[in-house]
């Protein structure tokens, strides 16, 4: 009996034929995969089978999209991503048209018979699973509950999309993130005791957010507006809609991330610094100039007034774009900005390659603590480590 492929167990070692996606004339089939959590896994399978993957839609390329994407189904030009999985599972190249989205459901087609079986003259039909519809097992349920318990940042996380997309990407199960979310909300939420699991915990940062939400009910997430989402939106629109609906939560998480990044080692709490995203166009003052022109407490308080709404909106827009570009969550992108002094170019390079473009290291909590010390030797060590310009930028960033 054909079982669902477990792509998570051995993603680097597919066993299907290396010519699976090579035509009879020796040319490789070309595929374009719409951005999704499954894109990397699909690309691995395609490349191992001798196919090629396009960065953009090219003439002659097979356009792949996940079932349920409204734009893809409306155009009629896309083939279900299930085509790749079924080809690999059977280790044979199947009929493309049987998986075309729009005119006929790929899921329904997959449930009738594998297209390709007739082409090969197979006389013995196999029991087939519904494409994209795999029954949930007890192991799947435990995996879902455990993942929520360990990764849910707040009660509202389970009604959003980011948590479930991350779980799908982790390949703990073979279900889509929409199915995982639906399974938890309709069947598993509140049933942890049946699986000998405790209630889903909330991280310390989330507990702070929850307390603030209780004090300010208008800023709290009710969860009800998220029911307005439709599963037909492509992933890019999911991310935009989720952040628009939770704008207040995004602002609070930025503040929380800042506080977590900077460990206070004195009794009195210094004022938190906001995230200011800069393009690094103007030259900041040198550390020497900065030490000679320290603003008094009243000036600092004036500078630390609330950021204007347009500035908040611009910051959220930039962070959202980086989340989509690198397929990362809000916390990861925010921490990257904090470690790179809010510099957009440096943060983008760090997210792409794991290091700054100028070759200098990123800032740590200990570095920030050292930066506050009135010690010439310590300051010189920081200048040697990060460069005078980066030290000056860090000082300016912390002032904001």
UniProtKB/Swiss-Prot annotation:
Residues 105-126, 196-244, 264-311 are annotated as: Disordered. The modification Phosphoserine is found at residues 36, 43, 154, 156, 203, 206. InterPro entries: BRCT_dom, BRCT_dom_sf, Homeodomain-like_sf, Rap1_C, Rap1_C_sf, TE2IP/Rap1, TERF2IP_Myb. There is a cross-link at residues 114, 194, 208, 212, 240, 373 (Glycyl lysine isopeptide (Lys-Gly) (interchain with G-Cter in SUMO2)). Residues 78-101 form the BRCT domain. Residues 128-188 form the Myb-like domain. One of its GO terms (molecular function) is telomeric DNA binding. The modification N-acetylalanine is found at residue 2. A motif (Nuclear localization signal) lies at residues 384-400. Keywords: Acetylation, Activator, Chromosome, Cytoplasm, Isopeptide bond, Nucleus, Phosphoprotein, Telomere, Transcription, Transcription regulation, Ubl conjugation. GO terms for cellular component: chromosome, telomeric region; cytoplasm; nucleus; shelterin complex. It comes from the Eukaryota. It holds the Pfam family Myb_Rap1. It is found in: Nucleus; Cytoplasm; Chromosome; Chromosome, Telomere. Residues 112-125 have a biased composition (Low complexity). Residues 280-305 have a biased composition (Acidic residues). One of its GO terms (biological process) is regulation of DNA-templated transcription. Coiled coil: none annotated. The keyword Transcription regulation applies. Acts both as a regulator of telomere function and as a transcription regulator. Involved in the regulation of telomere length and protection as a component of the shelterin complex (telosome). In contrast to other components of the shelterin complex, it is dispensible for telomere capping and does not participate in the protection of telomeres against non-homologous end-joining (NHEJ)-mediated repair. Instead, it is required to negatively regulate telomere recombination and is essential for repressing homology-directed repair (HDR), which can affect telomere length. Associates with the I-kappa-B-kinase (IKK) core complex, composed of CHUK, IKBKB and IKBKG. Homodimer. Component of the shelterin complex (telosome) composed of TERF1, TERF2, TINF2, TERF2IP ACD and POT1. Interacts with TERF2 (but not TERF1) with its C-terminus. Interacts with SLX4/BTBD12. Interacts with TERF2; the interaction is direct. Belongs to the RAP1 family. This is Telomeric repeat-binding factor 2-interacting protein 1. It comes from Macaca fascicularis.
